[in-house]
Structures are given as structure tokens and as C-alpha cells.
Amino acid sequence: MRQLIKKLYMGIIRFLNLIYKKKKVQSKHIVIMMTFAEDVCPIVEALYPKGYAITVIGNEANRKYLQQFETINFLPAGNKRVFKHIKALSSAKVIVIDTYYLMLGGLKKKPNQTIIQTWHAAGALKQFGLTDHQVDLSNAKMVSQYRKVYNATDKYLVGGEPMVECFKASFEATDDQFLRTGLPRLVPYTRLDVVKRQNELKKQYGIEGKVAIYVPTYREHKQANRQIDKSQFEAALPEYTLLSKLHPSIATEDQTAINLQSMMILADVIISDYSSLAIEASILDKPSLFYVYDEAQYEEERGLNTFYKAIPEAYKAYTETELIEKLK
């Protein structure tokens, strides 16, 4: 059924390609597809003052932030609005994306259009793309669909050679596609005194002592996302306040509303698993612990790369009790 729905969806996009085939590309029009705000907001903020016509396709949660930019055209994400999305994309000179968007596999890109990927991570510890164990490489139709989406990308923003290696393996990217500019999501950290801002945030939120944040990666099923018992954690470690934020795709109401970058600044220690946020923490010179209760299962189902496997066991905890002991 899922494959049938995808086939129908791609058929609609091909039909829309025909409708907007003659729509001219506007040299100052940029479309930004926003799933992870922290990855593309710095791009919006940099481009807006330069007079570009910017269209953002994103979640309703981001509309309020974008209202400060009076001339930005906001289109809510969702399959019901695919007609408006393709219309906007058909006239864009540059399209900026931050993750995998199925529609790009069916979009008929015009010769003078460029798609730039600013992947939603400072690095990678898990497999993704064609190296993800969930991708059945023997299924030619599945692999072909993934490749159509990956091949739509012209350029990748990267912050270091390890991600070049990952993109080559996962997306079959080539050397000429990499823009070694660094990542927009890291720019805000370079513009502030992190220690000073950490103290300001602790005061703002009424937090005394140390802060531990728990920021696990995406898992396919919500029931597989184990949360840390906040009461038990703080009773065992009274000098700590624990804040949790799950991956945006599986977020719950039981987590903090503080935005991710503020949490990273607030933190004295980052608890993650296979998430790239541990790499981001190193840029902030903050220690990380890896709570990897399902390491064997995750390796089997999704796959963990050589960078994860190089992490010493001393930094890994497989139970909540072990995690607490390592923090004492």
C-alpha cells in the first residue's frame, strides 16, 4: 500500500511538472524547504537582507518565527499543498533542503536550477541513505526511488572531511558536489560567549547547578524511544537538572519546550546515543555520554558507522543505572 501511495504521489508531481514546465526561473527566487529550523534559519537570516525573493516550505510551528521577515512567502508543508509547492519550486533559481524530500525524486529540474543540501547534522555516527540497513539493496525499484531523490541534489554543504566520506557512501555524492563552507547550524555558536550565555539561560529558567540534556536520535517506532526517568535521575544526582528533547519526528508532550540550540548551550553534559549532537557538543567543548541501551538492535536494524565504533566503551552506558554511575 505504501509503495502504491508513493507511486500515485510521484504521478501527481510529474503531472504538475507539465503544468509548470514553461514557468520561468526567477534569478532572485530562493525556495527553502524547512524541516529542521536550526539548520536553515541562519540561511534565511543571511539571505533576507540581500533582497532575495524567499519562499519557505515548512511546518506551521515555524510560521511565527518567519513573520518577522515581512516579504517571505510561507507555504505550509504537507501533501495536500503539493500543487503550491511544485509551483514555487518551478520558478526557484536555488532550492535549499535540509533532509530527504520525496517530491524531489519526481521534480523535473530545469537546467538553470540548483539544489543545495545542508544536511541536518554536524556529523554522523549512524548509517543513512543507501548504507542504512533498512534499505533493501536487492529491491531495484526501492533503490531507484532513493537514487532519484539523492541525484536531484547538486551541492552539499559540509563542515569536515568525515561528512564528505559519509555523503559519498550514503548518497553516492562526488568530489565536485561538496561546498566546504562549514554548516549554517553552527554559526550561532560562533557569535556569542557560550559560558556567559549559559549562565544567562540558567538564570532565565531558574536552574541552579549543572544541566544534563538527553537528546536521542530518531527511531522508527515511538515505543523504541526510551526516556530517562527524570525523578530517579535527579534524586541520584541532586546537583543536576535533566532536560529531554526527542527527535522532532517523534517528539512528545513530556519534553522541554526550550529550543535545541539553547539546550546545547545550557548543558554541562550531553547525553545522546547515535545522534550527531554529540559531535556538535564537541565543537562547544562539552562532554558527552552515549546512552546506548539498544546498540545491538540499532546496529542490526539501521547500522552504525566506523566513527561510532571508534568511541571508547568508557563513554557508553547500556542501562540507566550505569549512566548515573558514570556521571557521579
What are these regions (language model features)?
Residues 76-90, 248-279, 283-284, 295, ...:
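Donor nucleotide-activated moiety binding/catalytic core segment of transferases
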Residues 50-55, 151-156, 241, 266-269, ...:
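Short active-site oxyanion
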Residues 31-189:
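Active-site and donor-binding regions of nucleotide-sugar-utilizing enzymes
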Residues 39-47, 169-170, 180-253, 317:
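Conserved catalytic-core segment of nucleotide-activated headgroup transferases in glycan assembly
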Residues 1-36:
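Membrane-proximal basic amphipathic "stem/tether" segments
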